[in-house]
Amino acid sequence: GLYDYIIQLITRFYMKMTDGQIPDFENKVKVMHAWGGRQVPGVYYNACKNNGISPITFGEAKKHGNAFKYICEKFVDATQYDANKMYDYVLIDEAQDFDISFYQLCRSIVKDDHIIWCYDEVQNIFDVILQNPKETFANKYDPKGIDLIEEQKKYPRMRNDIVLHKSYRNVKKILLVAVALGFGIYNDKLIQALENNKHWEDLGFTVVEGDCSKEERVIIERNEKASPLVVDESRIEDCIRIFQAPDFSQELDWIAKEIEKAITVDKLLPEDIAVICLDETNSFNYFNGLEQRLEAKSIATYNVMDRDYVKGFYREGNVTLSSIFKAKGNEAAMVFVIGCDVFEDKKDSRIMRNKVFTAFTRAKIWLRISGTGEECLKQMLYEMNQLKEHEFKFDFLNKPTHLLDKDWNERSENYDNEQAFYEELLEMSRKKGISVDRILQMYTQKKKEDEKIDE
């Protein structure tokens, strides 16, 4: 689902940096699915072809449990973790969805361990265990893996971890609702949390009160600068709208009418609207019924769940209908998250919470939430109302729970300290008229002399 969007973003950035030149997607930059096949290029399929290995079909792979994990492990074994180097760099997006076997496959086909992976653990909807690089890249062919601390020493000016403090995708209100529900801030028990105050601060929040490393009350708010996307104050209340339908048919009727209004009255383009179904079991019935209603209103739809779907999330003149997985990484001005009644019985599930977070954060400006049944969104509404009553701050008792990945936090802090020292060193170099190289030579020589004295 991300294919076209990534192509668009790369092209836009490349043109800006090169005064209008178009990137060479045939020979220089490859944007691919992870698996691939004869009709659609993919990392695994292309790697097999490049290394003289017969690609394993899905039909065969699924006999062994986790099909994708199986084929990646087989590739690593077949090449003994040392395949032909096909790429100068490999960038993995939505990396939280991939098993470590895929990371190892990518490492085996790239030069000099030049791998960049981007992830958001709160969007981990498959319960994949995110490990540190040592464990992720270590196997029987290389027990050491990749040690980012050691790599940092080799390249002191290069940052191994970059934490994105700002969120340009969503207006602040939608982001805060998504985080509150994703973490279970106002649930009767906290579902997941960040390890300490700095972890929150790194992500654009301010801990107003409390210590997030302890079991105590904490109050957290969002920095204004960390959410630069703003909407007119008169339309803030319209950002999020919720509908509890008496029955399934009326839920579909409401969604269709809201989409029609958005296009005819608010003048949104159909491709500015996406519908994401939280109820995966009934997604076919939802989309089938919605397609019929929208067709009656002369509104075209693009169902990325169709069997004939190949790639892309948007189609000009069409409203997108999508699963949560296909929507990951994409966005739309207005997003309908439907079938939300399934949340009620799974409110204590971390995977369900992550799905809600992922679905809600696809919306840039307008979020529409619906479900079927009397008081079907009771828990969700309760938590959202609690957030509103607390003036969109997180006010909760921090308790032991699932901690989101914290390794990068320590590495990020190490980098900040090292970068600050390096800048001080540069400043001293300028003031004293001594080059940095000369300072390092003097330091090395002095260290050797001190070691001799100690002996």
Task: Indicate where each model-derived feature is located.
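P-loop NTPase motor core
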Residues: 1-45
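Conserved helicase motor core of SF1/SF2 NTP-dependent helicases
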Residues: 2-21, 89, 96-358, 362, ...
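Conserved helicase NTPase motor core
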Residues: 30-34, 38-39, 43-135, 166, ...
